[in-house]
């Protein structure tokens, strides 16, 4: 039995590797005109990721879109942070969903070298005040795994209160998040994050393996792929069926694959 399981795992890994090869060996060149350049975590190569200062720098660098990550606190506030805990990016520790906003505001963000800065974790409201419709906001709700209960409703409430729905798109790896948002408001602009699609079969990898069909994701506007996993044929197929595509995350303009794309998510929007 163990040998059978091992064989299946090896088969899946080999199949996934073959699928990724399409993107790795795709023709490369300078970025195509019309691509939406998105500052990943605000433009993380320009400052402390997901900080207000970083977002401002990303906008100043010409990013047409700013990407952020959000989590919900124990007192139902929405804060902007990539990780579910404070440990990596701040001077504090602890899970965000177990802390109040007041507790979170007691800690400072760290720079890329691990040194404390004067920057604080911002709230979603502060980010909306900063962007104010000057760029698109690409907002990622992280995979829930029992955390972030009620985050969809609270995010939607804040976006409506701040008249931000018109310039906000929400993305997630988690189908349950996307499905919940669509049920709350079918007019929301929603995008599906994924690592890639297995070659030759209707299976995608988004942290889990699941069946892919255009019918299942009919409410999705765009599929956002790991940059080495989207090849020409798949991109053309998705566009033919009415979807857009973005790729994440890389910082070298000359490595942009020469395939049909709608956007690039990068830590260095200033280089594009």
Model-derived segments and spans:
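Phosphate-group recognition and catalysis centered on beta-loop-alpha active-site segments
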Residues: 2-272
């Amino acid at each position: 039995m163990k040998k059978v399981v091992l064989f299946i795992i090896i088969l899946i890994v080999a199949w996934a590797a073959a699928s990724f090869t399409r993107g790795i060996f795709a023709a490369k060149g300078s970025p195509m005109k019309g691509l939406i350049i998105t500052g990943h975590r605000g433009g993380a190569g320009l400052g402390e990721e997901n900080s207000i200062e970083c977002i401002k720098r990303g906008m100043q660098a010409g990013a047409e879109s700013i990407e952020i990550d959000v989590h919900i606190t124990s007192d139902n506030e929405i804060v902007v942070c990539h990780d579910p805990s404070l440990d990596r990016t701040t001077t504090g520790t602890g899970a965000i969903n177990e802390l109040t906003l007041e507790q979170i505001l007691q800690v400072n963000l760290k720079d890329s070298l691990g040194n404390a800065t004067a920057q604080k974790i911002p709230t979603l409201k502060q980010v909306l005040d900063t962007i104010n419709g000057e760029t698109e906001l690409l907002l990622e709700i992280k995979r829930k795994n029992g955390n972030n209960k009620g985050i969809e409703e609270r995010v939607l409430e804040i976006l409506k209160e701040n008249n931000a729905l018109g310039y906000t798109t929400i993305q997630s790896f988690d189908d349950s998040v996307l499905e919940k948002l669509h049920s709350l408001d079918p007019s929301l602009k929603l995008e599906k994050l994924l690592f890639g699609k297995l070659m030759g079969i209707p299976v995608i990898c988004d942290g889990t393996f699941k069946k892919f069909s255009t019918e299942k994701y009919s409410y999705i506007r765009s599929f956002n792929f790991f940059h080495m996993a989207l090849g020409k044929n798949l991109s053309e197929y998705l566009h033919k069926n009415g979807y857009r595509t973005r790729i994440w995350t890389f910082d070298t303009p000359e490595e942009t694959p020469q395939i049909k794309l709608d956007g690039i998510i990068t830590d260095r929007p200033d280089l594009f």
